[in-house]
Amino acid sequence: MRDPVETYMNLVPMVVEQTNRGERAYDIFSRLLKERIIFVTGPVEDGMSTLTVAQLLFLEAENPKKEISMYINSPGGVVTSGLAIYDTMQFIRPPVSTLCTGQAASMGSLLLAAGHPDMRFSLPNSRIMVHQPSGGFQGQATDIMLHAQEILNLKKRLNEIYVKHTGQTYKAIEDALERDKFLTADMARDFGIVDKVIDKRSEEPTPKAP
């Protein structure tokens, strides 16, 4: 059976750009990276996280002051992989704007909320979902207890991050994340995950001149 990732990559369109040295071909995502646009798409896992972190660091090296745009369409995934992206967003110097296209669930919603203040956006038909972390463990009883304590520590840390970026109280975040909480774009704005719901290009943030 053919690797679905290989099939997908073969379908990525190429764009041709005219330069002083002739034509140059890029895959569409590399071309958009030149415009400082990053895509966080699909499940959050170590491979995707590493690529996203690398792109953030590259764009910072290119211009430490110019805005980076992050387009998010993700069901979430591995907490530590998501936190690697989150920490890098906070660590680098350029402001990172976030825009939800499709869905931002679980870790996807945390990354959406982690954008620069007043630069977090959602398209009108996007869906956002927040919840507490989940996991399953097996092994010796003591090890299971240690893993259970670790996931509780992660839950507390994630709650604190949501508090920081949404302006909600810790109790409100804890209650909201107790079960899967689905939000429309407008509800996510009212909750503090995004700053604005946009439906026109003219309202979308554009990179500032260096």
Swiss-Prot record:
Location of the active site: 106 (nucleophile), 131
CDD domains according to UniProt: S14_ClpP_2
Extent of the signal sequence: none
Location in the cell: Cytoplasm
Gene3D superfamilies assigned to the protein according to its UniProt record, in alphabetical order: 2-enoyl-CoA Hydratase, Chain A, domain 1
Transmembrane segments: none
Keyword tags: Cytoplasm, Hydrolase, Protease, Serine protease
InterPro entries for this protein: ClpP (IPR001907), ClpP/crotonase-like_dom_sf (IPR029045), ClpP/TepA (IPR023562), ClpP_His_AS (IPR033135)
Role this protein plays: Cleaves peptides in various proteins in a process that requires ATP hydrolysis. Has a chymotrypsin-like activity. Plays a major role in the degradation of misfolded proteins.
Assembly mode: Fourteen ClpP subunits assemble into 2 heptameric rings which stack back to back to give a disk-like structure with a central cavity, resembling the structure of eukaryotic proteasomes.
Protein name: ATP-dependent Clp protease proteolytic subunit
